[in-house]
C-alpha cells in the first residue's frame, strides 16, 4: 500500500555498466510512476542532438569539378568516394574547432581510415574502407574537418564555406550511434509501483558513452536554468542538500567496498584515503600523483568509480563538495577519537 506523501521520492540508486568501449547501460531508480519516461525521453533526444562530435564538412579534390565527376585511376567515382569518406569518424587532435587537412596518395593501393591519421586528425574507425587507386593514379584532396553538434545539411555548409573550389558535405556531427531506454518495474520498500530507467548508449568511438551521457545531462541542466531566473529553484535545491542525503550514496562507504586489488588498496591506504567520496573529490591528476600508484591501479580505480556512478573528478558533486568534505573530515575525526 502506498502512503500519502507531500513530494515525489528522489531516486538514490545509479549504476553504469560498460559493455564495451562504445556501449554502456546506465540505470537509475527508484522513480515514481510516470517519472521514468518523463526524464528518459528528453535525455535520449539530447544524446542525439547535443553531443559534440566531429565531421568532414567540405572537400576539394585536385582535378575534380563536382561530386558527380570521375577520376582517372580510382576505382570509385567521386560520388561513391564521398559516401565512403562520410562514413569515416574523425577526431581533431588539438583544441581547435576546425582543421584543414591535406592528403596525397600515389600508386596502386587500397586506402583505409588509418591512412588518413596524421598530426591534425585521427580516424577512430581505422579499418573503414575509402577507395582503391591504381599505379597511374595520384589522389590529392583537401578536407575540412570541424567540431559541432547534431546534423548540418550540405546546403548550409556551402553558404558557410563560400568557396567554389570545395564540395560541401552533409555533416553528421553526433558521435551517438544509438540511444534507447527501457522503463522497468522495480520493488522498493516492499512497493512494486516504482520505476527503473535503463538507458543504453552506443557511440562511434569519438567519445565514450559515459561522456555522451554527461554531455546530455549538462545540456538538460543548461536548458532548464532559464526558469531559475524566476523560480530560484536551484538555490532551494542546493540548500536542501544535507549530509543525510549523502549518506544514502556510496560516497561515505569505506574504500574496502570497492573490492580493489591489493596493490591499489594499499596505495590508497598509505595515502590516507579512507572513503569512496575522497576519490570522487579528487581530479584524475591528483589521483595519478599518489605515491606508488601505477597506471594499472589508476585505470582500475577510475573504471570502478565510473561503474558506481561517481567518476574520479566528477562534476556531479559541484553543489555538495563542501558538505561531502566536511562529512568525511567529521567521520575521520570520530575514528581517530
From Swiss-Prot:
Assembly description: Homodimer. The RNAP catalytic core consists of 2 alpha, 1 beta, 1 beta' and 1 omega subunit. When a sigma factor is associated with the core the holoenzyme is formed, which can initiate transcription.
Listed EC numbers: 2.7.7.6
Entry keyword set: DNA-directed RNA polymerase, Nucleotidyltransferase, Transcription, Transferase
Region (Alpha C-terminal domain (alpha-CTD)) location: 247-337
Physiological role: DNA-dependent RNA polymerase catalyzes the transcription of DNA into RNA using the four ribonucleoside triphosphates as substrates.
One annotated GO molecular function: DNA binding
Protein name (Swiss-Prot/TrEMBL): DNA-directed RNA polymerase subunit alpha
GO term, biological process aspect, one: DNA-templated transcription
Organism from which the protein derives: Campylobacter jejuni subsp. jejuni serotype O:23/36 (strain 81-176)
Entry's Gene Ontology cellular component terms: cytoplasm; DNA-directed RNA polymerase complex
Free-text comment on this protein's domains from its UniProt entry: The N-terminal domain is essential for RNAP assembly and basal transcription, whereas the C-terminal domain is involved in interaction with transcriptional regulators and with upstream promoter elements.
InterPro entries tied to this protein: DNA-dir_RNA_pol_insert, DNA-dir_RNA_pol_RpoA/D/Rpb3, DNA-dir_RpoA, RBP11-like, RNAP_asu_C, RNApol_insert_sf
Gene: rpoA
Location of the region described as Alpha N-terminal domain (alpha-NTD) in the Swiss-Prot/TrEMBL record: 1-231
Enzyme kind, highest EC tier: transferase
Organism superkingdom: Bacteria
Family affiliation: Belongs to the RNA polymerase alpha chain family.
Catalytic activity of the protein: RNA(n) + a ribonucleoside 5'-triphosphate = RNA(n+1) + diphosphate
